[in-house]
Every structure is written in C-alpha cells, then in structure tokens.
Amino acid sequence: MPIITLPDGSQRNFDNPVSVIEVAQSIGTGLAKATIAGRVNGERRDACDIIEQDSTLEIITAKDEDGLEIIRHSCAHLLGHAIKQLFPTVKMAIGPTIENGFYYDVDLDRTLTQDDLEAIEKRMLELAKTNYNVVKKPVSWQQARDTFEKRGEPYKIAILDENIERTATPALYHHEEYIDMCRGPHVPNMRFCQHFKLQKVAGAYWRGDSKNKMLQRIYGTAWADKKQLTEYLTRLEEAAKRDHRRIGKALDLYHMQEEAPGMVFWHNDGWTIFRELETFVRTKLKEYDYQEVKGPFMMDRVLWERTGHWQNYADLMFTTQSENREYAIKPMNCPGHVQIFNQGLKSYRDLPIRMAEFGSCHRNEPSGSLHGLMRVRGFTQDDAHIFCTEEQIESEVTACIKMVYDIYSTFGFTNIFVKLSTRPDNRIGADDMWDRAEAGLSAALSANGLEYQIQHGEGAFYGPKIEFALRDCLGREWQCGTVQLDFALPSRLDASYVTEDNSRHTPVMIHRAILGSIERFIGIITEEYAGFFPVWLAPIQAVVMNITDSQADYVQQVVKQLSDAGLRVKADLRNEKVGFKVREHTLRRVPYMLVCGDKEITEGKVSVRTRKGEDLGTFNIEAFVEMLKAQVKTRELKLLGEA
C-alpha cells in the first residue's frame, strides 16, 4: 500500500504497487503524456518502474534537465537501432550522453562518410516517427550475456564480463528488433526523440586505450523541441565562424605544427596581443600589491617528490636527464615560489607576501585532447602565490575575488559562475587540514555574497579551489580563474615564518590565477570578439592610406604622429584603389582606417572610417590621436561612434 509524496508535499495512496507512469496518470492525462521518467527517493527511474514502498516522487518531463539528458541517451539507442538496420554487421560498443548530445562508438568494416551519416539520420527519423514504445526488460547476467552472444555483440559481452557483477540484474531496452543494455532510464516512447542531428564521425579507441582497436565514434545532438535544436545549430554555425583557429590564421596571429604538438608559434600580431595582456595584468599586480618573480622552468626530481607532484602528477610531466640526474619541466609554478619564499628569514610582520609570475609551464596532455590555443602543452600562466597566516585567509581570498571580477569586467565578461571544488580521493594532507581549507574558501565566498556550486572531489591533490567560469556571447562557459588554498605544500617544502612569540609556523599558501593560461585566454577572447579586438588589444590600431601617390608624404607624416604617441599604426601606400585597401583592412579587423586625400592635406586632417564600415568624418590629427590614446588608456571595448 505505497503512499507517494509529491514535490508540493501532497500525498497519494495506492492499494497496490504502482508504476511511475500510473502515478502521473492519477494526477492528470496531460502530465502522463509528458512523463519521460521519474525521480523516486531522489533516484532516476524509468516510467514503467514499479514503486512498492512509501516513496517521494518527482515526475521528469522534457522541460527538466534530467529529461533532456534521457532524451539524448535514448537518441543514442535510436542511432544504434538505425545503424543496425543499415549496416547489419556493425558491432555496438558504448553510447553515453555528453554535453549537448550523445555519441556511439561502433565497430564497422568500412569508414563512415558524410553520406552515411545523412542516411543514418534519415533512418533514425523514420523510426522515431513511428512512435514505437521502448520496452525495458530486466534479466539475469547470464541471460544478458546469452542475448548478446546470439546477436554477435563482443563489446557488450566485454562490458558484462568486466564491469557488471554476476549477481546483477541488467536492464535490456528493446527498440523493436534492436536490443541495447543500459542502466537507464530511457524514454517510454520514441515520440520524445524527434529533434536531433548527427554531427560528425571521429576515431576512438575501445576503452580509451591506444592498445585497443580503433572504433568510429558518431556524434549527435538532441533537444526537446525543434526550436531548441534550431537555436543550438545556429549557435554552432556562429561558433564555427568565431573559431579562434580560423581567425588566428586569417589574422596571422600564430600557427602550430606537427613537429611541436601543443606548442604555439606566435607571429608578430599575436605576440602583440600576448604582450598587451601581460602589460595589463602587470598594472593590476602593482595595484593589488604583488611582487613579480621568475623561477626556473626545470627542477630536480627530488623536489617534485617532496611536493607530491611526482606521485600524483607524473603522467602529465615532461622529464629529462643530465649528468645522472633526473629533471622535470615544471607543470606549475608553486614549488618554485616556495623556494623563493624560503630564502631569508620571514616574520609574521612580512605577511602576506604576494608573489606573481608569468610562468612558462608544460604539461604532457594527450595528443588527442589538444585543440588550438584552448588545450596546449606549453603555456604561460598568470600565476601568483600568497603566503599568509590563517587569520589573513578571508581578507586575502576576498582581495583575489575582487581582482578576478575587476580584470574580467575589462574584457566585457560579466556573467561569471563560481564553483567550489572539494577534496579528491587522490590527495595529500590530513583530513583536518582539508576541513580548514574548505571552510576558509567557503567563508570567503559567503562573506562576499557570492552564490556558488559545490563540485565534490574536483579539487587539486594539494588543496580545494574556487573556480571562476566565464559565460561568453554564445552561452558557453570557460573556466579560467582559480583560487586555491594549500596547507600542505608549504609544510612539505619547509616554509616557515617567525610568529609574534618567536615560534615557527608554516604559512598558508593561496594559489591564484586569473586569466589562467594566457594562450587559452587569447583563444577565448578571439572567439568572444570574433577577431574584432578592442582598440587597446588590436595588433594594428590604425592604418593610414593614400588615394594617389601625391599624398604619400602626408601619410608618412600622420603615421609618425600616431607612432610617436605610442599607437600601433602602419601606412598603406600601395598603388591600389582606396576602396580595395579599406576592404582588405576591414577583413583584417583593423579598428580605424585613416584616408588621406588632397582635401585632407589642405585642411591638415584625416578622414576616419571604422572596421564596421562607419564613416566618422574628418578629424584634426591631434584630436584623433588624443581620442585614440584615451580609448587605449581606458581600455574601451567599443570604437568611436559605436553605441
């Protein structure tokens, strides 16, 4: 006689065990029709699952985040259904959900083409349009194995043999003649899976191990309705236009090549942006009372063993040997900063010490994960470490938070999401240390009135951390800034200071990064601005061009005036029509184009156009220089004349 408690606190009594869908039907036919699954006592369950005891129940529909994930997971099964009909010999591996969609790894004796993808998608839609029911059948482990043995599915058998207990009751989901195995839940009917798109095929090793067979991974996206799907595909198109790799090539910012995977070759214009970012951060370091240091990029293995990196981070570290000593190229700057702190006696009066570095770091990221500037092996971190007392934690973390928001606002990022990552399973330090560290960060966030999400187990091995994620113009989130509290590393490296009573205490170390990897941040802002960098970041801030050869000397005079004022400017004296020059520099996203004709020479002025095509009219040269300098000084995001 189960009593079902609903989210609003109301209760429904049933004489017999009842399914999730039957509870929904008792509430209303509209809700029953919309039911995808249920959350029983906090656990997601299929709509057909039976509730035998008193329970809480929340109905899951397509409006819920869980409902959308279930739709995507069921679309992966729908993909399996379709590809099995088109390619009966295909072997199915795994088909999980991912952000915004799903994928399925398949083993097929031919390479899938774009035409194949379109055919599979067409068959998926045909099947979904029949609105067939998805039937869940719990079976014994042996029955599941026998089923996949008969169907010739070696990967499903491997999952059963290696990942599922013999005493378990696996669930088989029947999509008409197609059978898949899953924890579920799944949609009860394919009418929920009508809005999807197959996107691409990529290679993927079985179990992610390069020693195993290479499979083909089919990626897709799925949404609750046509509007959501269309909006997502539109965002993808816009993201493709903004791809920093494409823009970086078009604007000649950088390149990468096979001989140095994950390493950036900065060209002049890209390096200009890089140096401007460094200069900007340096002004903030001075404002927030940091000292800037520089540590070695390679240190002996012995030091990395003391820090715990060798035991916890070795897979991501590049190593080398010399004179019978083993060295590691630093993946992060913190151990070097502790060495600098340890030089000379420190008193409590010296604290806090805020130590910053634009540190050149290297991490041996898997080659398959490398992605333009967003995921590299060699990068520069705008890193800092603050050595302080426990009493200073809240005020120092508060100052870090203020600095983060201060810097991000300069780039126009105002949607910032905060996450607190707590202790991972693989960590150093005692639990009481972690208790104090997590409490310290939590207190600082609360004191600053910040809402935050807790990410259990996502902290670094040496301490918990606050993460700051930026939401860009396409709604994507980029995790950049971090503030981490560390009681362990200073102790391991014998850092200490003299207290007021002349005893020795270990300082707390706060790890702080704001841009994170400068390389990655350039990738982010390249996509955010679509290459239309604000004038203070633009590699070339203005181009001065002539109409005929008779204005060449005047152009050079204007260029000199701008250059002497500290602006980045160049002349275009080519024997081309001025319209051609304007179009070319517009494509290069140069903020301002200054045109000099005979009239401008006579009046001692320049005609100014923006890269967005707006004609700003004529300016006295001195007046334009002052306006441009003001834009650079205040780091304006918009050009003159822009709303």
From Swiss-Prot:
Subcellular location: Cytoplasm
EC number: 6.1.1.3
Annotated GO biological process: threonyl-tRNA aminoacylation
Catalyzed reactions per annotation: tRNA(Thr) + L-threonine + ATP = L-threonyl-tRNA(Thr) + AMP + diphosphate + H(+)
Region (Catalytic): 243-534
Xref: Pfam families: HGTP_anticodon, TGS, tRNA-synt_2b, tRNA_SAD
Entry keyword set: Aminoacyl-tRNA synthetase, ATP-binding, Cytoplasm, Ligase, Metal-binding, Nucleotide-binding, Protein biosynthesis, RNA-binding, tRNA-binding, Zinc
Annotated binding of Zn(2+), by residue: 334, 385, 511
Classification via Gene3D superfamilies: 3.10.20.30, 3.30.54.20, Anticodon-binding domain, Bira Bifunctional Protein, Domain 2, Threonyl-trna Synthetase, Chain A, domain 2
Enzyme class (EC, first level): ligase
Coiled coil: none
Domain TGS: 1-61
Main location: cytoplasm
One Gene Ontology term, aspect cellular component: cytosol
GO molecular function terms noted in the UniProt entry: ATP binding; metal ion binding; threonine-tRNA ligase activity; tRNA binding
InterPro entries the record matches: aa-tRNA-synt_IIb, aa-tRNA-synth_II, aa-tRNA-synth_II/BPL/LPL, Anticodon-bd, Anticodon-bd_dom_sf, Beta-grasp_dom_sf, TGS, TGS-like
Family: Belongs to the class-II aminoacyl-tRNA synthetase family.
PANTHER family noted in UniProt: THREONINE--TRNA LIGASE, CHLOROPLASTIC_MITOCHONDRIAL 2, THREONINE-TRNA LIGASE
Complex and partners: Homodimer.
Name assigned to this protein: Threonine--tRNA ligase
Organism listed in the record: Haemophilus ducreyi (strain 35000HP / ATCC 700724)
